[in-house]
């Protein structure tokens, strides 16, 4: 990293960042492979040493500019065992390295700006978790009856993304290469819906797309920082840029800036005395104190502003005025709402006693049962009605591997949806996975589910059927006496940094 910093010379205030030559450096691709993402499919050949040579990179660029970019003959496949028959490998390798290179000016300039201002950077692993959103919603959104549910649109033209990066990167060669990538391999569906990947780009190329998407979204989100400074009574507290998370964390008294990881996972929090803003993936929520008329004015103020100054075509129907007390809010894999929680308090003064009825707003979260059953049905764990079926592709595995894979999916779902106010829907999902596992094992041994479990015993599924109480008792052995009460309440785990698509579980 020091070598990259010396090359860019970002400490000079008006230094142009010539990033294009970095594409030909071997260590760039080594660093891109070591940033926590599973790229083992690129390295299936044991003879490959996890690096790209200068000659290979030059050949990749040459092949991409040829007429048939993705065509590989059988002779070439036999001569080069590393590339094989993967038609997406050429743009895939360059895309990974190019995304890593584009992130350098953002991260390094952020470090330098914080160092100049002598701000203390606090690294907090808890803020990385997706679950950290929901305590924020519980503390603030329960007081707001109306929120704006916003579906973030895509830029109307690809050139807008290039123009956005021109403010950060002054290297014309890199921008030309970026423009080539966008027009040749771009697919917007792969951004908003990762499971609908482009035919020319696999899911390994989402890093470049998410980086461009978040850099563009951060541009129009800057309006909230401006509005916050205009409306806040504490204008002395400065506010920084809203960037992605992992390296840099700074917390100010009236403002929370969450810097997320490598522009990969979309999450921004902005805390203001009058306005609250949350974004996750392609959806954002804006809440403010006021009447429905006031929120409607916000809607018709922001839409023309974003369209005129940021070229974002916000259709009015993509911004909904949601009353949380009557409608559910779909956000972050949960269905959320605000309901009145009535409680009766008995008070006694001397010889007189009386009852006080108290009602407070409570922010509830529920498991979206229909979308989850749809995902399980697409992954062939059940049919569209939720009836468990056997998983044919796993019948060739050992019994322990089958139980482990089903159990891992069940534990991941239970882990993420542990914040649900009601567990009935979660129990149904776990029942589908358990019975699907039993049917898969019975089909492998050519038996019925009842006969199979009776012959081998229920201890075969002991690890798979482990309850949350047992998991918590293993995690917190000293607090076993109070686990029963904790289990009934919602639990937010601050170690969840990504979601796994069930459809891709094999």
Swiss-Prot record:
Gene Ontology terms for molecular function: RNA binding
InterPro entries linked to this entry: Domain_X (IPR024937), Maturase_MatK (IPR002866), Maturase_MatK_N (IPR024942)
Keywords: Chloroplast, mRNA processing, Plastid, RNA-binding, tRNA processing
Pfam families: Intron_maturas2, MatK_N
Domain of life: Eukaryota
Subcellular location: Plastid, Chloroplast
Ranges in a coiled coil: none
UniProt record, GO biological process: mRNA processing; RNA splicing; tRNA processing
Assigned GO CC terms: chloroplast
Primary location class: plastid
Family: Belongs to the intron maturase 2 family. MatK subfamily.
Function noted in UniProt: Usually encoded in the trnK tRNA gene intron. Probably assists in splicing its own and other chloroplast group II introns.
HAMAP family reported for this sequence: MatK
Record's protein name: Maturase K
Primary gene name: matK
